[in-house]
């Protein structure tokens, strides 16, 4: 599975320049805690400064650039025998080509239980981080249609999708639930 060709630049940008504001998102911020049961095992993909740490008992934060992560690796390189009930992909699966995005989704899906769910916050291709370095980032142009197509491709259904705003930007929020075949 290919890594982003500018992974080193992305790691530097997200460890030194970017700052998150998870608390201000209406759906994909701390409101997600309402979807978590105490027994749920959760992986936070691209967890940044690991804001859910201490709020979710069985959480593993994976991030290639932030030292507050439980595991400092790109998701493509993360290996474990553990399976997770829920994956958070909150602004992390936003960079690169269709091939890179598809590979990252395949990896995340492989880490989930048969009843797994994925919560998404996706950037619809906007370079709105309010700094010049952001112009060098290759944002994937997410749409609700792409989220629906990928959900279907990987055996999930979309159970919620809406715009999610904070004081700085507008993002796509989406929840996937695995489809059971009988």
Question: Could you describe each region identified by the protein language model?
Answer:
Residues 1-79, 117-182:
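Class I (Rossmann-like) S-adenosyl-L-methionine-dependent methyltransferase catalytic domain
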Residues 91-95:
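Short catalytic micro-motifs in class I SAM-dependent methyltransferases
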Residues 102-114:
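A short glycine-rich, Lys/Arg-flanked "PGG" loop and its adjoining helix->strand segment in the class I
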């Amino acid at each position: 599975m290919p890594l982003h060709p500018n992974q080193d630049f992305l790691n530097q940008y997200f460890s030194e320049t970017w700052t998150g504001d998870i608390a201000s998102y209406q759906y994909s911020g701390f409101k997600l805690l309402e979807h978590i049961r105490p027994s749920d095992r959760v992986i936070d993909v691209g967890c940044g400064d690991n804001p859910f740490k201490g709020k979710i008992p069985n959480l593993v934060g994976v991030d290639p650039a932030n030292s507050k992560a439980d595991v400092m690796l790109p998701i493509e390189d993360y290996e474990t025998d553990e399976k997770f009930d829920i994956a958070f992909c909150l602004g992390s699966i936003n960079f690169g080509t269709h091939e890179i995005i598809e590979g990252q989704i395949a990896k995340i899906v492989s880490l989930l239980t048969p009843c797994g769910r994925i919560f998404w916050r996706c950037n619809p291709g906007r370079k709105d981080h309010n700094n010049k370095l952001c112009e060098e980032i290759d944002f994937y142009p997410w749409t609700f249609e792409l989220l629906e197509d990928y959900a279907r491709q990987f055996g999930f259904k979309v159970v919620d999708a809406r715009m999610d705003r904070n004081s700085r930007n507008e993002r796509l929020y989406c929840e996937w639930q695995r489809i059971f075949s009988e």
